[in-house]
Amino acid sequence: MNRLKHYLLNMQSNTTTYREMYDGESILMFPNREPEVQYDPVYWHEDISCEISYTHKLAYSKPTLTWSIPVEKLGFDTVTSAAADYCLRAFIPYIDELNTGLYNRSRPDDENGKYYIHKPGGEVLVRNTAYFALRLQKDYINGSGNTVYLPDDDVSRPPKMCLCIRMQVQLPKGKLRKAIQMLCRDLPAAVDMFIARFDIVKFNQAIALSKKQADIRAWLQKSDYCAFIANGSILPRAKTTDLPLTGAIPFCSTPNGEIEVCGVRGMAIRRGVTVITGGGYSGKSTLLDAISAGIYDHCLGDGRELCITDASAMTISAEDGRSVKSVNISPFIKWLPGGDTRDFSTDHASGSTSQAANIMEAVDCGAKPLLID
């Protein structure tokens, strides 16, 4: 990060563009020919790279940083979306700790500085905030200032598979010393701490869970069932959050509906028409919500880790006032005044016509299970 520090130290204290940091202009010295000017906004902390890019043309003081950490430093070689998801969740506490040290309620973020990183819900998804990619290794030696030297050693430096974590940093206005501390000292130290304390045991548990989820999904595709809810799952969510409800009663299948799938016992829902009945506040909608959420895998601790649903499932609801264009709703509504239900269009659908359109659109898109509350 020496080159980045050089750029920041030589900026005007009242700068608002941070142009030098984004350009990465450096003087490249060759062993046997004249030096050249190159532009490289990738900065190195030992063998870990950090690429700095614009977040928005009107937000120069809020750069986007992409850290690339060789997976060999973390001790694994599994490069799946579940692996990236676990790494993102493991990295977040170190950013939260940095923000705790920066926090000053009397100043806004653009004066005080702040780190931003995506905080996912319980779903395990492919994200552009954490992914794996091949990255080039550092192929130069830092000199003074923005001068770099190409080594004359003919050593091959093939690209390495890296964990890439993307985040943003709000740099404090008019405080370049603090910006240097945030970018060149505190953030690299947090990355080092993340690597040093990486919990490979919990990582392996997350990978094992993702394999179990994939096995159950594969079983659903070949079976007469469209959803599975494992015994012991925590289905209710805490108010206003996606976290499991503290003190909730774990799900338990009825004996006559219980089956075993891939070594896990629970309740499976057959293809066909299934009606969930019960009194008020008995958990009907909670169960249906869990089935709906089962199109996604969930992380350890979410409570719905082994609630698995056919990925094509679609939740159907009435949407008063929505627009409908050229949808055949004749299977549900045979006649409407002033319109052909085989080619129905409106800018303001009623509850019944919007729900009929939702069903037909879902079927046209290939949805198999339809969930209606």
Describe the role of every protein-language-model region.
Residues 309-373:
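Switch/coupling sub-region of P-loop NTPases
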Residues 264-292, 296:
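Glycine-rich phosphate-binding P-loop
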Residues 245-267, 322-343:
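Active-site-adjacent "gating/activation" loops or surface patches in catalytic cores
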Residues 297-311:
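Flexible phosphate/Mg2+-sensing switch loops adjacent to catalytic phosphate-binding sites
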Residues 1-224, 235:
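N-terminal accessory targeting/assembly segments
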Residues 162, 177-181, 238-242, 279-281, ...:
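Short acidic, glycine/serine/threonine-rich loops at helix termini
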Residues 166, 227-229, 236, 258-260, ...:
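Structured core elements
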Residues 208-261:
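Charged, amphipathic alpha-helical linker segments immediately N-terminal to NTP-binding catalytic cores
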